[in-house]
């Protein structure tokens, strides 16, 4: 395995943050913790229900980690929506992360998918059964156009996860394959459409702006995620089917060339995002900018992405990119580095245990280094 290209990664990340004029001021610390706990608490109670526990069959520690990661993503990025919308989106996107980590073969339970859908029968695939049950709670926040995007993008995501189970990076020469798979499993349209709740945005009068935002967000959010995930995925055997690695196989290019391709696409998309909406409806631009800044903060602060390791490695270096990266990282940490012990309680496993014993909800938080993922 070749060495991680630290200098290149620093330069790319710094340019990205400069292009989007990164300055996350979405919340005060108190507001951030309040929203995190509200969304987490509702989502944790949802996943602690016996039906969810029985059908998902997810390791409690992994479910806890997935929930904490997703609540952070939603609260940090969807800064302009209501707390109730944050909570419902947190549940939906936690389901997607659970599916993304699943290794179960979907084929047997998808044979009659459309027949069951048309007849109004419960889906045989347990994930779809649970997601469909929760979907009305999500869609109630949005108009019909945005709702259709959420439904369609979620269906695409399921199919993308199905494809990923084959660990197939594409045939050499199949240049369309990497972006085909990334668009399918990236949830870009779901994310782009879920920024516009109907209580805040009239999707009929802002139809062109919302449509354009969904189109731009599809690539921007997945490319930024791919770029900022590159470090954690670089030498992880479980993360070898990524956009960059698929470019290497399908385009028959080097890893450096593949990373450069992703870099240029991400930077161009960032320029577009700012340029296209800077003179449009101010509320639309504000929502997009808050999302971009919060999304970056989440990546820099969430332990899943391990970017603190890059910071520790380069914080004593005197190069311009190293110093700029560290400044951005510290800026993000000042607003976004919040310990889960301050908001992610009680653990899902404890709530599930309480429910199974038919005991009333525990009032005092119980924090365990085993059950709560720091």
From Swiss-Prot:
Annotated stretches, region: Aspartate-rich domain: 100-104
Binding site residues for Mg(2+) 1: 100, 164
Record gene name: TRI5
Enzyme class: lyase
Pfam families linked: TRI5 (PF06330)
pH dependence: Optimum pH is 6.75-7.75.
Annotated phenotype, changing residue 146 to F: Leads to the loss of activity
UniProt lineage: Eukaryota, Fungi, Dikarya, Ascomycota, Pezizomycotina
Impact upon substituting residue 190 to F: Increases the KM for farnesyl diphosphate by about 1.3-fold and reduces the kcat by about 2000-fold
EC number: 4.2.3.6
Protein name per its UniProtKB record: Trichodiene synthase
Enzymatic reactions: (2E,6E)-farnesyl diphosphate = trichodiene + diphosphate
Cofactor binding note: Some of the cofactor binding sites show unusual localization within the protein.
Organism per entry: Fusarium sporotrichioides
Required cofactor(s): Mg(2+); Mn(2+)
Family as reported in the entry's similarity comment: Belongs to the trichodiene synthase family.
Something else known: Trichothecenes are sesquiterpenoid toxins that act by inhibiting protein biosynthesis.
């Amino acid at each position: 395995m070749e060495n991680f290209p630290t200098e290149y990664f620093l330069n790319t990340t710094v340019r990205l943050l400069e292009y989007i004029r990164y300055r996350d001021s979405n919340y005060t610390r108190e507001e951030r913790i309040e929203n995190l706990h509200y969304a987490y608490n509702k989502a944790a109670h949802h996943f602690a229900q016996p039906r969810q526990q029985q059908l998902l069959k997810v390791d409690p520690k992994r479910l806890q980690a997935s929930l904490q990661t997703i609540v952070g993503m939603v609260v940090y990025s969807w800064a302009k929506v209501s707390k109730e919308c944050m909570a419902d989106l947190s549940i939906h996107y936690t389901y997607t992360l659970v599916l993304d980590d699943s290794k179960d073969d979907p084929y047997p339970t998808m044979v009659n998918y459309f027949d069951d859908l048309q007849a109004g029968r419960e889906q045989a695939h347990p994930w779809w059964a649970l997601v469909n049950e929760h979907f009305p709670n999500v869609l109630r926040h949005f108009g019909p156009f945005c709702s259709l995007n959420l439904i369609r993008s979620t269906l695409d995501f399921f199919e993308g996860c199905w494809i990923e189970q084959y660990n197939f990076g594409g045939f050499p020469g199949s240049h369309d394959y990497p972006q085909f798979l990334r668009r399918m499993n990236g949830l870009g349209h779901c994310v782009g459409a879920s920024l516009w709740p109907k209580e805040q945005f009239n999707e009929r009068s802002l139809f062109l702006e919302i449509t354009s935002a969904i189109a731009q967000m599809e690539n921007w959010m997945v490319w930024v995620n791919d770029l900022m995930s590159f470090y954690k995925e670089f030498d992880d055997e479980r993360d070898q089917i990524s956009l960059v690695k698929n470019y290497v196989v399908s385009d028959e290019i080097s890893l450096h060339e593949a990373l450069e391709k992703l870099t240029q696409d991400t930077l161009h998309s960032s320029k577009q995002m700012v340029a296209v909406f800077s003179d449009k409806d101010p509320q639309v631009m504000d929502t997009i900018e808050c999302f971009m800044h919060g999304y970056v903060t989440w990546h820099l602060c969430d332990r899943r992405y391990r970017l603190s390791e890059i910071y520790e490695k380069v914080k004593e270096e005197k190069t311009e990119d190293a110093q700029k990266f560290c400044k951005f990282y510290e800026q993000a940490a000042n607003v976004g580095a919040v310990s889960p012990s301050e908001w992610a309680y009680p653990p899902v496993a404890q709530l599930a245990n309480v429910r199974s014993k038919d005991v009333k909800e525990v009032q005092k938080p119980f924090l365990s280094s085993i059950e709560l993922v720091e």
